[in-house]
Amino acid sequence: MAKKSKQLRAALEKIDSTKAYSVEEAVALAKETNFAKFDATVEVAYNLNIDVKKADQQIRGAMVLPNGTGKTSRVLVFARGAKAEEAKAAGADFVGEDDLVAKINDGWLDFDVVIATPDMMALVGRLGRVLGPRNLMPNPKTGTVTMDVAKAVEESKGGKITYRADRAGNVQAIIGKVSFEAEKLVENFKAFNETIQKAKPATAKGTYVTNLTITTTQGVGIKVDVNSL
C-alpha cells in the first residue's frame, strides 16, 4: 500500500491539476503516469449539460472504435434456428434460449455483451432485474436487439462500445489500453468525441461539454481542454 501511495504521489506531481490539457497531452500523461502492473484500461469521462429527465435529452448509443478496445468481449446471443447458427458462425461465445435464461438466473454471468433477436425479447425480459443494473439488457439503440446477429457479434468482438448518460449527465467509455500507441488512443478518442458531439440534443442550452477527463485504471484523472476539441 505504501508503494502504491508513493507511485500515486509521483503521478500527481507530473500532472498540473489547475491545467486543462490537449487530447494529445492528456493521452501522453495517462500513459506516462500509469503505475498499474497490468495493461490498464484508458477511459474518457464527460460531464454534459443535459437534462436526462427530458426524453429528447437522453443520450445513449453504441459505436465501433477504429482501433478497438484492446479487450476481447465474451458475447452471448439469444436466438433460435437459422439466427442461432448465424451467431455461432460469427463467433458468439454462447448461443441459446431458455437454457441460458435458467443459467443466468442461477447466478452465471461470465459474459460481457448480450444480443437478442426481436422475437426473443419476451424471454430475455425475464432477466431484467439481473441484466438491467449491469447495463447488459439488449436494446435497439445500442444495436443489440437485431435480426442481423452476425454483424452485431462481429462488431462486439471488434471494438464496439456502448455509452449512456447517467442522471447527472456523466458519460464514460473505454478508448483502449495503455499498451496502445498514443496515436491510436487519440484516434479512438476523436472518434468517440465526434459521436458525443453529434448526439447533442437540439434542445440542450449553454455549454454542452462542461468537463472532460482521461484516466487509466487506478490512475489519476487528467483534465482535457474542451475548447481544443
UniProtKB/Swiss-Prot annotation:
Matching entries from Pfam families are given as: Ribosomal_L1 (PF00687)
Q: Which GO terms describe its biological process?
A: regulation of translation; translation
Q: Where is the signal peptide?
A: none
Q: Got a GO cellular component term for this one?
A: large ribosomal subunit
Q: Which residues form a coiled coil?
A: none
Is Ribosomal protein one of the keywords UniProt gives this record? yes
- What InterPro entries does the entry give? Ribosom_uL1_bac-type, Ribosomal_uL1, Ribosomal_uL1-like, Ribosomal_uL1/biogenesis, Ribosomal_uL1_3-a/b-sand, Ribosomal_uL1_CS
Listed A to Z, the keywords are: Repressor, Ribonucleoprotein, Ribosomal protein, RNA-binding, rRNA-binding, Translation regulation, tRNA-binding
In alphabetical order, the GO MF annotations are:
rRNA binding; structural constituent of ribosome; tRNA binding
UniProt lists the family membership as follows:
Belongs to the universal ribosomal protein uL1 family.
Subunit details: Part of the 50S ribosomal subunit.
Q: What function does this protein fulfil?
A: Binds directly to 23S rRNA. The L1 stalk is quite mobile in the ribosome, and is involved in E site tRNA release.
Name of the molecule in the record: Large ribosomal subunit protein uL1
